[in-house]
Amino acid sequence: NDGGQFEPRLLEAMKYSLLSGGKRVRPLLVYASALAVDQCTELTDSAACAVESVHAYSLIHDDLPAMDDDDLRRGKATCHIKFDEATAILAGDALQAIAFEWLSAPLIINRDIQSHVFLGKQLQCVRILAKSSGYMGMVAGQAIDLAAIDQTLTIEQLSRMHNLKTGALISASIQLGALSTCNVNEFQLAALEKYADAIGLAFQVQDDILDVTTKMGILGKRQGGDIANKKPTFVSLLGLEGAQDKANTLYNEAVYALSDFGKSADYLRDLATYIIKRKF
């Protein structure tokens, strides 16, 4: 708070959605990718906060009656159930806005040359996050998802949808982490992009698997939600065993993309393992 007025109920809804648990995979990917190429900086912290805030906003809006109409998220009432629909919409709007406020905030950099370099990095990070979360990324994926209800998709169409809806923000997290450091080269960025493409899709495949194999008490949301909403999933297209094979293939692709990094990318490897082994 910068001393201005704010609406307490709106702030409460924002905190409820941003701080009420979750896996924090996206900010962890920011830090892990930064450590893979160099050291974390103040911009790394800003990027981690920003991607999680965008993710929280997207969940609020996804859960709304006009979208997925869910009443349970992370084992708790969804934002529009806990508060009301209008407050939930505004909380999502505000969380999206504050993400870019954090990402573009002035950095405390001691050396002038770093200050100049990091201003350019901030602008690049803002552009990446905006593109990945907007009409060419996450929002596009959600639009395709809504249009796919009661439709039959090919595996290629389903993959494209989730590359946008889920993978775009995961890819942005990894790019922002690497760019937030003092030293990263184009070869490293290209390898991290391949890792991001594979692990972003693997995340969604595992989500589809958990949707049919994990009980609500562990999953934190209603089991079989996508099937109930008549949405195509990797399990519905490939079967459970086929979806598990798909997740393992994507995991191997992600780990292979990190071959040239050595031990500095161990956190990214660990996160890849977690993503396909998780139970919620």
Task: Describe each region flagged by the PLM.
Residues G4-L258, S264-I276:
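Mg2+-dependent prenyl diphosphate-binding active-site environment of isoprenoid biosynthetic enzymes
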Residues R278-F280:
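Short cytosolic juxtamembrane segments of multi-pass membrane proteins
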